[in-house]
């Protein structure tokens, strides 16, 4: 089954083709992402109306490009998957409208995919994919969640952020210290040159039971440290390192607690912050110490992309699901409300 995936939930236009007749890395026949960073940079954040208009401009050319790279004609597709939520309503409607129109014209099924389920399942596209049950850390600019995955499609949220998401905290902290948009990756790069331990910030909510997160207080700590400093380049790097270490430690501590609570030893990490080098190293070290395993998607599939939507959509289409002809999107959508996935013959992601 060859499935076209379309991602348009925010400021990336992503398109991919996933082929269920293949497995591992080769099953992703082609994927392409267009980022709107340059468009939104002068505003210091995403402008929803501009995002929607840019998706309109870029989506069809990107579909043609991706099909060409996959070596496929459009009439060789067997299904179309699109992000139906959560996200910016206008941006979601662009992708959903194009996907539904293509599916109708080609007489193939379409399926709306939960954006965060796409992220959660992205590591399953790699060689030697993780098998459920496992715990997933979904960590991005808009979400920070710990999810117990008993089987594919069966999700229980164990903990989540009470205020800022981790990626959002990275971006806002970077902006406080004068780094250009988007600040998160810039701050992480700057932290590489910082001196460890010169600035030590709190590890929020790790001194009490529970699996929820809070990063607003940490952000305030950093702001006060920055304002009272000499604001030199060296100090900026040292504060960035202290902030990143605090976030990474907090995420790692909560992940280990979640594994204990769920009674399993496999951790899946996905979302844009999952590409952070220090977070990857810290979680791999922690997993090795407890004799467990941590699984990440390749860095290119950590940020928003069409590949994860094509893959998640393919699994649900194979299970017999499909969307009706109407164009529906859900800007706010609880992943725990998703229907469980029927067991696949391939056994992808589920232990026997």
Swiss-Prot record:
Q: Name one GO cellular component term.
A: cytoplasm
Reaction catalysed?
L-threonylcarbamoyladenylate + adenosine(37) in tRNA = N(6)-L-threonylcarbamoyladenosine(37) in tRNA + AMP + H(+)
Q: What is its EC number?
A: 2.3.1.234
| Amino-acid positions noted as binding Fe cation in the UniProt annotation, renumbered to this chain | 115, 119, 304
GO molecular function terms listed in the Swiss-Prot or TrEMBL record: iron ion binding; N(6)-L-threonylcarbamoyladenine synthase activity
**Biological processes annotated in GO:** tRNA threonylcarbamoyladenosine modification
Q: What is this protein called?
A: tRNA N6-adenosine threonylcarbamoyltransferase
Disulfide-bonded cysteine pairs: these are none
Q: Which gene encodes it?
A: tsaD
What NCBIfam families does the database record attribute to this sequence?
Answer: gcp_kae1, T6A_TsaD_YgjD
Coiled-coil annotation: which residues?
Answer: none
Primary role: Required for the formation of a threonylcarbamoyl group on adenosine at position 37 (t(6)A37) in tRNAs that read codons beginning with adenine. Is involved in the transfer of the threonylcarbamoyl moiety of threonylcarbamoyl-AMP (TC-AMP) to the N6 group of A37, together with TsaE and TsaB. TsaD likely plays a direct catalytic role in this reaction.
Name the predominant localization: cytoplasm
What is stated as this protein's family in its record?
Belongs to the KAE1 / TsaD family.
Where does the UniProt annotation locate this protein? Cytoplasm
Q: Which cofactor does it need?
A: Fe(2+)
Family annotation (SUPFAM superfamilies): Actin-like ATPase domain
